[in-house]
């Protein structure tokens, strides 16, 4: 048994995880990446419920479940009783009653999971696949795994997060845990898209002020679907003011890495030809998503077996 195996009742927010739990998930993800096997003979059942569009999170959870040998119960929102007005609570209550062990959920409502994990009747474990502009723990963990593979530590690393900060659950998840891990944080992007909560975790800067100093340069997608009004910038203006141009890429330190949670608006956040540039770890992030999600699923199922 690996010393990095652990039992977690739910994984819903980076705020709820200790540094030790986070490090074990990262290291267990690396073990899975290196070929660790964990077949489940009792065939636990997992259901993925995505109420918002997703490619990477949804499909990497599916691949993780396949690799672990789990049984997957398909849930199609479009053909479910949600279209008859059934609440999320009653949907999960039903799946729990049917014997589903784990529900992976993405939902537009921030903190949707609080009601579910507080219920004495719902016994299924909850993994948050993203709640509105709130939290995205599995994305944060795969980002951390990618950074850890590169540098072997977090203490003292300079990390810049740039883009649509206010609407990004990735930014909020990462800023909370990276500060606890000892990284120095910087936030860049349009003033219209940043709130004072970020000031508690790092410094507001322009991208040009910081790009030649950072170890990690993380860009965020412009989330048009979460904006109340039309675009503040044209694509060209945004890219020129806040995106990764060739000139900015050339200013990165030799050892710096480029990250983005994807999907990417090419030639907006990052110039098209730089998405797969030598300093980019974007593809590695996607790959790591499978293995860290295997670690998350394992930890939640271990908790169920212990109870």
Curated annotation (Swiss-Prot):
UniProt keyword list: Pyrimidine biosynthesis, Transferase
Enzyme class: transferase
Record-linked InterPro entries: Asp/Orn_carbamoyltranf_P-bd, Asp/Orn_carbamoylTrfase, Asp/Orn_carbamoylTrfase_sf, Asp_carbamoyltransf, Asp_carbamoyltransf_Asp/Orn-bd
Pathway(s) the chain acts in: Pyrimidine metabolism; UMP biosynthesis via de novo pathway; (S)-dihydroorotate from bicarbonate: step 2/3
This protein's GO CC annotations: cytosol
Organism domain of life: Bacteria
Catalyzed reactions per annotation: carbamoyl phosphate + L-aspartate = N-carbamoyl-L-aspartate + phosphate + H(+)
The keyword S-adenosyl-L-methionine belongs to this UniProt entry's keyword annotation: no
Binding site for carbamoyl phosphate: 56-57, 106, 136, 139, 262-263
A GO molecular-function descriptor: amino acid binding
Enzyme Commission (EC) number: 2.1.3.2
Gene3D superfamilies the UniProt entry points to: Aspartate/ornithine carbamoyltransferase (3.40.50.1370)
GO biological process entries: 'de novo' pyrimidine nucleobase biosynthetic process; 'de novo' UMP biosynthetic process; amino acid metabolic process
Ligand binding (L-aspartate): 84, 169, 221
UniProt keyword Transport present: no
Similarity remark: Belongs to the aspartate/ornithine carbamoyltransferase superfamily. ATCase family.
NCBIfam families cross-referenced by the UniProt entry: asp_carb_tr (TIGR00670), PRK00856.1 (NF002032)
Purpose: Catalyzes the condensation of carbamoyl phosphate and aspartate to form carbamoyl aspartate and inorganic phosphate, the committed step in the de novo pyrimidine nucleotide biosynthesis pathway.
Subunit structure: Heterododecamer (2C3:3R2) of six catalytic PyrB chains organized as two trimers (C3), and six regulatory PyrI chains organized as three dimers (R2).
Name of the protein: Aspartate carbamoyltransferase catalytic subunit
Gene name of this polypeptide: pyrB
